[in-house]
Amino acid sequence: IGLNYISGMILNTCFATKATLPIAKLYSLIRIEDDLIESSSYFYKEVDEIKKIIADTGNEFNSILLLDELFKGTNTIERIASAKSVLSYLEKQKSHVFVSTHDIELTTMLDDQFALFHFTESVVKSTIHFDYKLKKGILEQGNAIRILEIKNFPKEIVESAKKIVCEMK
């Protein structure tokens, strides 16, 4: 999305049959890393970047926000609560928000505010293949345990994980 936006605006070319691109500021929050030299944790750096985005959105310019797994540097409950609150806020601004998440709870909380899409995969001969085609709606089945299985994790771990998932649903 980001590369298509940039190439569309600069080169008047993008990978699309048709594109209508708004004049907007593009923000990407995808590859944040800990910085041991500056004693800055992943979470603190992410919070600082999100705060900059919040301060910059809602002004006279539209914004396109590309966000990946918000607040993944903290515990599950606070991550989901914080991400839901930030995304709900950004959605009210002049923003086009694109966010990726593995948090099923977050997707159900945002279902009435955002158009939800997902990717699926198939397993062929113990190899996982992604088609990278967006499908509407919430992903119904995860793939983490299946990947553990494909990577030949001990059966005890795989079965235990499956059991825990069933108990948590």
Where are these regions (language model features)?
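ATPase nucleotide-binding head domains, primarily ABC-like/P-loop NTPase cores
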Residues: 1-169
